[in-house]
């Protein structure tokens, strides 16, 4: 596992929500982020195939940037959400 600093933001919509902090990138290329719910309960959020979809930032060492599309099911509907992801290995 690699330790990373990350920043994740939704691409579409009016959402200004940004997730950032310290996380881990496992051997399969999944970014694991520690989060806290609105009720204060901790949980781990996983973003699959981040290592595949992110590419090195030109002129920066150990920094990567890209887009990941995730699919969720909500009340019988499939929802597509695209995230802009930046991370730096430390």
Locate each region found by the language model:
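Acidic, low-complexity, intrinsically disordered interaction modules
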Residues: 25-82
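Compositionally biased, intrinsically disordered low-complexity regions used as flexible
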Residues: 1-2, 57
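A short beta-strand micro-motif
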Residues: 3-11
């Amino acid at each position: 596992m690699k330790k990373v600093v990350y920043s994740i933001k939704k691409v579409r919509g009016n959402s200004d929500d940004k997730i950032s902090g310290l996380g881990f990138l496992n051997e399969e290329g999944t970014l694991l982020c520690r989060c806290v719910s609105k009720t204060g309960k901790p949980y781990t959020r996983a973003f699959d195939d981040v290592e595949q979809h992110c590419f090195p930032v030109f002129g920066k060492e150990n920094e990567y940037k890209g887009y990941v599309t995730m699919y969720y099911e909500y009340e019988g509907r499939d929802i597509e959400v695209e995230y802009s992801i930046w991370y730096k290995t430390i």
